[in-house]
Curated annotation (Swiss-Prot):
SUPFAM superfamilies the UniProt entry points to: Ribosomal protein S2 (SSF52313)
Cellular component GO terms, alphabetical: cytosolic small ribosomal subunit
Basic and acidic residues composition bias: residue spans: 225-239
UniProt name for this protein: Small ribosomal subunit protein uS2
Coiled-coil stretches: none
Positions of region (Disordered): 224-246
GO BP: any one term: translation
Protein's organism: Bacillus licheniformis (strain ATCC 14580 / DSM 13 / JCM 2505 / CCUG 7422 / NBRC 12200 / NCIMB 9375 / NCTC 10341 / NRRL NRS-1264 / Gibson 46)
Family: Belongs to the universal ribosomal protein uS2 family.
Lineage of the organism: Bacteria, Bacillati, Bacillota, Bacilli, Bacillales
Source species, domain of life: Bacteria
Name of the gene this protein is made from: rpsB
């Protein structure tokens, strides 16, 4: 059975590309036709590519790999946060801070600062500090949480990135490519598919389309994790049986 159906893709508007004047010729192989000045994406190809992305993500997660979800455009922010959290992965859904990957040590220092202020808030330090200082610390905490909250438990570089709109997230794409980190991407008709390792040709502007495809990647991760849990349970049961028999 397919990971996703043509009906689901149609209902979510995944097939609507950009206006014909705003296109990347490299996306030609994923375009079915043109209608009223808009390119229509070939959903048969999208079905296959979603399957490919699903299996890639599932296999990576089964090996203990970590995936960073990236989507800072308004249509993607909520889905990226919800689905990354649901699958126990990391996310960036506000501004991508330059150097998030390529200057990882500096980013880790900012994350440490975020955690230090959180501790101060929790252990009562705020209660003994001057009010003015507390106000400044709270503002700093809010800003750090906004930009780094989704990666504050990311102790090392991710094993892959899942990106919504690589054109919008071109800095993230450039950093991942520089470090040879594979990229899975929702790629619309105005994007360059050559920059992405696993291309999902799809509408990257419709909230429903973004939600549907992002949730499928989270499902792949959860399926891999459930497989791990089942294997662990079976191993424990086998051990118990052996002990009892002995």
């Amino acid at each position: 059975m397919s990971v996703i159906s043509m009906k689901q893709l149609l209902e979510a508007g995944v097939h609507f590309g950009h206006q014909t004047r705003r296109w990347n010729p490299k996306m030609k192989r994923y375009i079915f036709t043109e209608r009223n000045g808009i390119y229509i994406i070939d959903l048969q190809k999208t079905v296959k590519k979603v399957e490919e992305a699903y299996n890639f993500t599932k296999n990576l997660a089964a090996d203990g790999g970590k995936i960073l979800f990236v989507g800072t455009k308004k249509q993607a922010q909520d889905s990226v946060k919800e689905e990354a959290e649901r699958s126990g992965m990391y996310y960036v859904n506000q501004r991508w801070l330059g150097g998030t990957l390529t200057n990882f040590e500096t980013i880790q220092k900012r994350i440490k600062r975020l955690k230090d202020i959180e501790k101060m808030q929790e252990n009562g330090t705020f209660d003994v500090l001057p009010k003015k200082e507390v106000v400044q610390l709270k503002k700093e905490l809010e800003r750090l949480e906004k930009f780094l909250g989704g990666i504050k438990e990311m102790k090392e570089l991710p094993d892959a990135l899942f990106i919504i709109d690589p054109r919008k997230e071109r800095i993230a794409v450039a950093e991942a490519r520089k470090l040879n980190i594979p990229i899975i991407g929702i790629v619309d008709t105005n994007c360059d598919p050559d920059e992405i390792d696993v291309v999902i040709p799809a509408n990257d502007d419709a909230i429903r389309a973004v939600k549907l495809l992002t949730s499928k990647m989270a499902d792949a991760i959860l399926e891999a994790k459930q497989g791990e849990e089942s294997a662990e349970t079976e191993a424990k049961e086998a051990e118990t049986t052996e002990t009892t028999t002995a």
